[in-house]
Amino acid sequence: MKKLIAICALALASAASFACETAIDPVTGLQLESVSTGWRSVGVVDGMNKLVPSVSFRLKNVSDHRLPSLQVNAVFRRVGEKGEWGSAFATAAGTDGLAPGAAAEVSVKSQLGYTGTDSRAEMLRNSYFVDAKVDVYAKYGSTQWTRIGEYAIDRQLIEPASP
């Protein structure tokens, strides 16, 4: 019985040690590549054109460990304001995780934006238009959300992807 308890204790200690050793800081373990920002048309809402801020990027695992259940949260803010203007959540890699050296394509857009009767291009040139920025956060497994990037939203229209 004592031998069984000793084996269980050793296995538990090894598992705890392994879990501690494999904790990867998202700031150093993930790399944002090919970041593209802009304003995406989400169609006509209540008779007006609607534009929302959007960000797309490749999220690369630069660590030497598989990162399970990799998630991304984008928080959009208008320049000069501290409060959240909108947010978007995406799963970059499911339970299989993101292998070392692998990358996932991520594209998210805010649910909030601007509406107007002007054309989409004219809306971006409007003197009352306020620029936006996005903070990108990531987490994997049971780790905490960590900010991995901040980007200005370019004042450009993002064309819809071809079918």
Question: Where are the predicted features?
Answer:
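A short beta-strand signature
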Residues: 53-57, 72-78, 132-134
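Sec-dependent bacterial lipoprotein signal peptides
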Residues: 1-20
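Short coil-to-beta strand junction motifs in C2/discoidin
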Residues: 51, 68-73, 123-131
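Short acidic, flexible loop segments centered on an aromatic residue
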Residues: 64-84
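Low-complexity, acidic Ser/Thr/Pro/Gly-rich terminal tails and inter-domain linkers that flank the onset
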Residues: 21-54, 154-163
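Contiguous beta-strand segments within globular domains
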Residues: 47-58, 107-112
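Short, solvent-exposed, Trp/other aromatic-anchored flexible loops in extracytoplasmic proteins
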Residues: 88-144, 152-158
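Asparagine-centered strand-capping/turn motif at beta-strand->loop junctions
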Residues: 59-63
